[in-house]
């Protein structure tokens, strides 16, 4: 294969790689509660992790600041793709694709499957009160979730170019959703079973929008005399007023089987409105036995139905095989080098140009259900100090995650409690903490992190992709 052809091929592969990344990034634009507060005494929002948990006082939240949760998680960190290198005597920050970063260094922090996620929740308004034989809450909140999965082969292709024989990046996918939520919760003691308390919540969701992007198949086989590339991708956008923009691709070598075609070049948003609705349930129980407190909850068991959905796709699997092209260095022939290279470019363009498949009537998806299991132990000789162990597992298809968290919780005085904890799970090791100031009547302030910030880049961006903040102001009465 001649040098000009190899150069052209490398450029095409680079375009494919960048296009694949661009498809995932827009979607990257369910830990919506702080797990550090699960065992924390007098934590106002424990019932959101287990609906059986109640409060000692009635309360009303400060609008929009009653329970603010911002969380970023990932196994792919900024320090894995950005490096400091001395270039021409000057220290510069460069991407992993820079020639001054070796392949070994670039791939050191890249896993076979790299996860990125953000989970944000704002409690717009919340209130809790004692009535009907138990404790009741009503919450109005806004929720936004983003998940992305990037295979290690995606980064290897971007770094190495075409040095390996095969690349498989089929696990490249992203999901984003936003919705409003109204939740009603009730919990009570079961008098017939001393120590047992149960609770349940019903939730109504109003969908703002959702986007799913995924490569069902993306393969590149590099033989000595033949290359084969295959792609199969879909994007589903459930956003009111959204339509895809299209452009017409004009082949460099038009002819039978290679006619002009329309492809998705972007999107337009005309107006704003609700895009779906859903319903969910929380179920929970806790049982106190001697110095132990056992708890179990299933949170967000339900569905979300999204309305009209715009679908863009490769329309099945697309394949390009280079041995179908015969190159002739005689410029006067139909299969001259330039003509065949143009035809090859046309075919490679079809691999990543998506077709507007029109509108689907609707999509129904299950909510990301979380199962929380915990056990707490109070020291017999100093009951103000308790230790807790919990497991949380979020069931969300390819974005499923789990974590174990061990915590020490102390409440030295009536108006103050605190916790420090360590966690390990899908997203690695974390250290969490929370401080909780609470009077029986008047004022409650809490602040904490499930994932404590580590080192920051010069721009103030965390080098580790795990970070969170939980903050709230409420008024007990």
Placement of each model-derived feature along the sequence:
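Subset of outer-membrane beta-barrel
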Residues: 32-477
């Amino acid at each position: 294969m001649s040098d000009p052809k190899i150069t052209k091929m490398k450029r095409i592969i680079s375009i494919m790689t960048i296009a694949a990344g661009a498809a995932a990034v827009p979607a990257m634009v369910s830990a919506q509660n702080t797990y550090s507060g699960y065992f924390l005494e007098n934590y106002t929002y424990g019932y959101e992790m287990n609906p059986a948990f109640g409060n000692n006082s009635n309360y009303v939240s400060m609008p929009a600041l009653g329970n603010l949760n911002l969380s970023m998680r990932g196994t792919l960190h900024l320090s894995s793709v950005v490096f400091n290198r001395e270039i021409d005597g000057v220290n510069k920050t460069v991407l992993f694709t820079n020639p001054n970063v070796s392949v070994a260094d670039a791939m050191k922090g890249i896993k076979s499957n790299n996860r990125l996620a953000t989970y944000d929740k704002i409690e717009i308004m919340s209130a809790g009160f004692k009535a009907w034989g138990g404790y009741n809450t009503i919450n109005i909140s806004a929720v936004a979730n983003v998940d992305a999965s990037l295979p290690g082969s995606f980064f290897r292709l971007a770094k190495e170019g075409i040095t390996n024989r095969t690349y498989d990046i089929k696990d490249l996918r992203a999901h984003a959703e936003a919705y409003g939520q109204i939740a009603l919760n009730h919990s009570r003691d079961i008098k017939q079973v001393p120590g047992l308390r149960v609770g349940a919540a019903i939730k109504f969701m109003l969908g703002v929008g959702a986007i799913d992007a995924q490569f069902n198949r993306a393969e590149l086989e590099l033989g000595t005399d033949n290359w084969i590339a295959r792609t199969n991708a879909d994007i589903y956008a459930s956003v009111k007023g959204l339509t895809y923009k299209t452009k017409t691709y004009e082949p460099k070598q038009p002819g039978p089987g290679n006619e002009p075609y329309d492809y998705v070049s972007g999107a337009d948003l005309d107006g704003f409105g609700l895009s779906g609705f859903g319903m969910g349930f929380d179920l929970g129980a806790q049982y106190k036995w001697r110095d132990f407190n056992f708890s179990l909850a299933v949170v967000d068991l339900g569905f979300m139905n999204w309305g009209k959905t715009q679908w863009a796709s490769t329309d099945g699997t697309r394949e390009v095989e280079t041995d179908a092209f015969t190159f002739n260095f005689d410029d006067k022939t139909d299969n001259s080098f330039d003509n065949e290279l143009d035809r090859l470019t046309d075919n490679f363009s079809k691999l990543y140009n998506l077709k507007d498949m029109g509108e689907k009537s609707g999509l129904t998806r299950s909510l990301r259900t979380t199962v929380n299991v915990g056990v707490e132990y109070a020291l017999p000789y100093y009951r103000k100090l308790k230790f807790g162990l919990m497991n949380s597992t979020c069931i969300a298809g390819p974005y499923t995650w789990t974590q174990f968290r061990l915590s020490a919780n102390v409440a030295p005085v009536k108006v103050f409690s605190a916790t420090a904890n360590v966690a390990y799970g899908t997203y690695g090791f974390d250290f969490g903490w929370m401080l909780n100031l609470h009077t029986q009547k008047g004022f409650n302030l809490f602040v904490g992190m499930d994932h404590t910030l580590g080192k920051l880049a010069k721009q103030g961006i965390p080098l580790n992709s795990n970070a969170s903040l939980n903050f709230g102001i409420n008024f007990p009465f």
